[in-house]
Amino acid sequence: VYYTRDAKVTFTVKTTDEQSGVKSITIYQDGVAKATKNVDSSNSATFTIALSDTAENKITASATDKVGNTMAPENYGSFANGAKLVHDITVPEIKADLAHFYVDTNMEGVTTYYEKQDETINFSIEQKKSGLNSVNVTINGTSLTEDKNGKSLTDANRIYKDVQQEMTTKDTFAISTSQVSAVGDGDYEIVIAVSANVDEKDVYTKTIHVHKENQAPVVTDFQVIGASKETVSDTGNYGYYANTDVTAEITVSDGNTGAGIQSISYHLTDADGTEEKEVTVECRKRPGEDAVIRIPIQAEFKGYIYLKATDNVGNVSLDYYKSVGILLERSEAHESNRNVVIEPEKTDTTDGKGNPLYASDTSVAVSIEDPYAGIRSIEWSVNAPYDTGNNRNGIVTVDNNGAISDEAWKITTADRNLVTGVSGQIPVFHNSNDIVVNVK
């Protein structure tokens, strides 16, 4: 078998006849005479034949001597066996099954196939007319001697070039990134190189860029728009406060080498542990792009946001991201949630208006509760119209870690970092009637 990419072939036929001498040579293509030429002084003739894509292109030749005897084509010279001339202008076809990969093409035009673990790539090579000549597969520059299933890649070249010229037009292999170590953060460059019998010097390649990535996306920023933010010592504590509806804004990243964010799932859980229905937001972010979602939260919510993100190859966090506590309470609700109790010391004496009357300094016991939002500050004052010099006032504050500014006041109840109950004594030193104690 002879192979060519040319539409026409030129060759010279030489013969001998020691008795009467050779007059002419006739060329046949698939048994049909194409041309007859007289021989030159060396008994040779040169022919140009147009090849057909739809025929076998078997070339034979016959010689006619000077007395008119013609020899049968099949019995003449090196073409006696009816050698085929395979005309093939096609190139090898290399196909790879990459449907199970996430694929992305960057701004530079480089296409990368992302995987979570070592996936199998099934590929086929084909040269329909002239047949395959060789195949070579490299991953990160390392030539594979066999595919994932143990099929030899080295023997393939030998079989394709078999001396019997048994044409192999198609072959299949299965490879995996597990066969070679990754470069950098999980990069693999797979090159499949194939040549055909029509021109074994021409090598045709298919390059596949694969990136293996097994890291789940992470939350890189969390904000509650419309709420004040306080520093917390523990993520289970409350740190965002507002008296209106707010919006939580969450940024999620899969890093510079990740596959990109596919979706984010979240649910709200209140302080009692009741979970709302989980919501999944489809993000479809490409590699290198952050995903930002906004979650509206109505006032009167007290609790946490739980969140998980999934990237484009299926990496997902084992545990939910838990936000800092969010506490929302409308002003009108605060009035019903708080409770202030003021108790003067007991006495059997009263003034003309029925108010308690004391012969000496006294004090007032104060108990304050806010089981929902907690206590952030206490403003108190003692005022009398006839002894203004002893009028007094003060402010007691509670920080976001639950520490109280005046040790004379005692914490009676708490909810994480929220101080929900306090008690204290307010001294009264006035020598006056109509003394008024205010607590806010």
Give the label of every model feature segment.
Residues 1-440:
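Low-complexity, disordered linker/stalk regions enriched in Pro/Thr/Ser/Gly
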